[in-house]
Amino acid sequence: MRHRIKGRRLNVTSSHRQSMLANMAVALVMHEQIKTTLPKAKELRPYIEAIITKAKKADLTVRRSVLSKIKDKKAVEKIINILGVRYKDRPGGYTRIVKSGFRYGDLAPIAYIEFVDRDINAKGKKMYQDASEEIKN
């Protein structure tokens, strides 16, 4: 029985899991939407939501606490200055998980995890411009 056991192992060591969650959190913050497997998305959701809830206070202690979880300074700045302000009045539920079928190679369930009320231009603005230029040509 797995009573009182929190989280998923994801078939990796604990240090690998912590590093992976931190890296996925940076990617989610910078792009505001990422594609990953469903169990990883479900594990990332409480990790990033706790960080954003802390970031709504936006003082030095919170900044240091967020920096201890996420090692990227640009991501921490975005969390404190943009996401903390954006979700100031929202009492949780900052992310959504959208199931997206199965991966071709191993049939792993794939999902998108994204911020609610996200900035559409945050994810690959240059990529969208290149695609629109190709359509025009």
Swiss-Prot record:
Cysteines joined through disulfide linkages: none
Keyword check for Ion transport: no
UniProt entry keywords in alphabetical sequence: Ribonucleoprotein, Ribosomal protein
Annotated Gene Ontology cellular component terms: cytosolic large ribosomal subunit
Top-level taxon of the source organism: Bacteria
UniProt-recorded Gene Ontology molecular function terms: structural constituent of ribosome
Annotated TM spans: none
PANTHER family per UniProt: LARGE RIBOSOMAL SUBUNIT PROTEIN BL17M, RIBOSOMAL PROTEIN L17
Assembly and oligomerization: Part of the 50S ribosomal subunit. Contacts protein L32.
NCBIfam families the UniProt entry points to: L17
Protein name: Large ribosomal subunit protein bL17
Organism of derivation: Rickettsia typhi (strain ATCC VR-144 / Wilmington)
Gene label: rplQ
